[in-house]
């Protein structure tokens, strides 16, 4: 019997992608598969996200992995290329790139490429992380349009900083700025990622870029993906390796941070921070065992965690324990831990077995 295992429901992935298409019917879909498909397995995700019109990645290595496994659809390097030496690789493998800074623009102007590269100009519409500032926009447009290494027409994109906050005044300002700058442009545009396409439909332009929602995880702090009609793709599970009697007043685990207030039974589950489950998970973080949630009791260790099963528990060694999934939303677990679900699904370690089902 394996210990921690991540079960990936590929039919749920396909359901979610179809739902994105239904919610943004006038847009083409760029499925974002960076960070190993948000921890779900890049190659499997790309193979089964076959209704996507293109793929978005963060690193050139991810793009090359997609090409190596037979993906022929467009691939966009969302952070752009890191050095001039990457440009011939983009040409050879037909990879599109974002341009967000002067250094990338100069590299394109100085390169000697066999064929032009498809470029998306990233505009800093208000997040202030990457992108061309509005006062730089005209100069960048002029230089990119006259650069022989840039395929025409030029494309345009930006990224929201607060799209998951529905009362934010920043997002409408970002939309207004982006639309005013790109009004009348011939090239295609992209503004909405997961939160944008769900909460700000006016940002659904020629392309949308679903990321976390495609994996059945909500971008919002107050809603699960299931609340929004999406299905969890990942279920992280393990099993009980011990059920122990603990007396009132006895402490459990490193540091003795949990002390039992009554005689009870404590279950030991074969999963820990060595598998990517956060050591920071506090007492009370829920785990699903035999049809109910039970609280973590004690500090998460490298290979194990402990839960309070209750004094009348009938759970047995080898019974299944679900850390998150359909029965226990990953968003709920993340809220208890004080993090976001994105972090939980992307931080599983290689020793977690990946099991794919359709």
Curated annotation (Swiss-Prot):
<feature type="binding site">
    <location>
        <position position="302"/>
    </location>
    <ligand>
        <name>substrate</name>
    </ligand>
</feature>
<dbReference type="InterPro" id="IPR009006">
    <property type="entry name" value="Ala_racemase/Decarboxylase_C"/>
</dbReference>
<comment type="similarity">
    <text>Belongs to the alanine racemase family.</text>
</comment>
<dbReference type="InterPro" id="IPR029066">
    <property type="entry name" value="PLP-binding_barrel"/>
</dbReference>
<keyword id="KW-0663">Pyridoxal phosphate</keyword>
<feature type="active site" description="Proton acceptor; specific for L-alanine">
    <location>
        <position position="254"/>
    </location>
</feature>
<comment type="function">
    <text>Catalyzes the interconversion of L-alanine and D-alanine. May also act on other amino acids.</text>
</comment>
<dbReference type="InterPro" id="IPR000821">
    <property type="entry name" value="Ala_racemase"/>
</dbReference>
<dbReference type="InterPro" id="IPR011079">
    <property type="entry name" value="Ala_racemase_C"/>
</dbReference>
<dbReference type="Pfam" id="PF01168">
    <property type="entry name" value="Ala_racemase_N"/>
</dbReference>
<dbReference type="InterPro" id="IPR001608">
    <property type="entry name" value="Ala_racemase_N"/>
</dbReference>
<dbReference type="GO" id="GO:0005829">
    <property type="term" value="C:cytosol"/>
</dbReference>
<feature type="binding site">
    <location>
        <position position="129"/>
    </location>
    <ligand>
        <name>substrate</name>
    </ligand>
</feature>
<feature type="modified residue" description="N6-(pyridoxal phosphate)lysine">
    <location>
        <position position="34"/>
    </location>
</feature>
<comment type="pathway">
    <text>Amino-acid biosynthesis; D-alanine biosynthesis; D-alanine from L-alanine: step 1/1.</text>
</comment>
<dbReference type="GO" id="GO:0030170">
    <property type="term" value="F:pyridoxal phosphate binding"/>
</dbReference>
<dbReference type="Pfam" id="PF00842">
    <property type="entry name" value="Ala_racemase_C"/>
</dbReference>
<protein>
    <recommendedName>
        <fullName>Alanine racemase</fullName>
        <ecNumber>5.1.1.1</ecNumber>
    </recommendedName>
</protein>
<dbReference type="GO" id="GO:0030632">
    <property type="term" value="P:D-alanine biosynthetic process"/>
</dbReference>
<feature type="active site" description="Proton acceptor; specific for D-alanine">
    <location>
        <position position="34"/>
    </location>
</feature>
<keyword id="KW-0413">Isomerase</keyword>
<dbReference type="GO" id="GO:0008784">
    <property type="term" value="F:alanine racemase activity"/>
</dbReference>
<dbReference type="InterPro" id="IPR020622">
    <property type="entry name" value="Ala_racemase_pyridoxalP-BS"/>
</dbReference>
């Amino acid at each position: 019997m394996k210990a921690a295992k991540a079960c990936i429901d590929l039919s749920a992935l396909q359901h979610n992608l179809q739902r994105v298409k239904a919610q943004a019917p006038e847009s083409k879909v760029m499925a974002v598969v960076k960070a190993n498909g948000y921890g779900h397995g890049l190659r499997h995700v790309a193979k089964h996200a076959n209704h996507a019109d293109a793929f978005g990645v963060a690193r050139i290595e991810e793009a090359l992995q997609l090409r190596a496994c037979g993906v022929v659809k467009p691939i966009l390097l969302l952070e752009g290329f890191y050095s001039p030496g990457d440009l011939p690789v983009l040409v050879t493998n037909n990879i599109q790139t974002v341009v967000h800074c002067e250094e990338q623009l100069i590299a394109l102007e100085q390169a000697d490429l066999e064929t032009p590269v498809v470029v998306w100009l990233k505009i800093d519409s208000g997040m202030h992380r990457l992108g061309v500032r509005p006062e730089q926009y005209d100069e960048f447009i002029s230089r990119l349009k006259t650069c022989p290494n840039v395929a025409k027409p030029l494309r345009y994109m930006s990224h929201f900083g607060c799209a998951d906050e529905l009362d934010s005044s920043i997002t409408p300002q970002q939309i207004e700025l982006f639309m005013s700058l790109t009004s009348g442009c011939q090239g295609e545009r992209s503004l909405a990622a997961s939160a944008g396409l769900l909460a700000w439909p006016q940002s659904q332009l020629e392309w949308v870029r679903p990321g976390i929602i495609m994996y059945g995880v909500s971008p919002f702090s107050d809603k699960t993906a299931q609340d929004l009609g999406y299905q969890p793709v990942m279920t992280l599970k393990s099993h009980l390796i011990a059920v122990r009697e603990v007396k009132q007043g006895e402490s459990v685990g490193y540091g003795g941070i949990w002390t039992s207030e009554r005689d009870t039974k404590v279950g030991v589950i074969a999963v820990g921070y060595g598998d990517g489950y956060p050591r920071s998970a506090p007492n009370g973080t829920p785990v699903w065992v035999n049809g109910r949630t039970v609280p973590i009791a004690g500090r998460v260790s490298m290979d194990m965690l402990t839960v309070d099963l209750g004094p009348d528990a009938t759970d047995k060694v080898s019974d299944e324990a679900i850390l998150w999934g359909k029965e226990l939303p990953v968003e709920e677990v993340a809220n208890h831990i004080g993090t976001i679900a994105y972090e939980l699904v992307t931080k599983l370690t290689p020793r977690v077995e990946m099991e794919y089902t359709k």
